[in-house]
Amino acid sequence: MANSYFQFKQFTVHQDKCAMKVTTDGCLFGGFVANAISNSELVINNCLDIGTGTGLLSLMLAQKKNCFIDAIEIDAAAAEQATTNIVASPFSDKINIIQTDARIFLF
């Protein structure tokens, strides 16, 4: 049986409560975006992750960039899983999980 988690260098992503699992595409995309934002000359203090799922992309960005991240997830079980993953990481002070529908979220 496959593991219900992915172990990264600085954090672990559990995914047993999420419909959308960690994939190679997600890891590659997260790495690309985190590097692009980290290497940008733009001053970026806040980021928004809509449909955070496990929290993977927020975690990948948090480890590369010193910014605050709001991560929105509509599914209660996935939001709970993301919260667990974030709290267990060294980046919990940089990421805020919000369980709501992004279509009604007040930006």
Positions of predicted regions on the chain:
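Class I SAM-dependent transferase core
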Residues: 1-37
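Conserved SAM/SAH cofactor-binding pocket of Class I
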Residues: 31-107
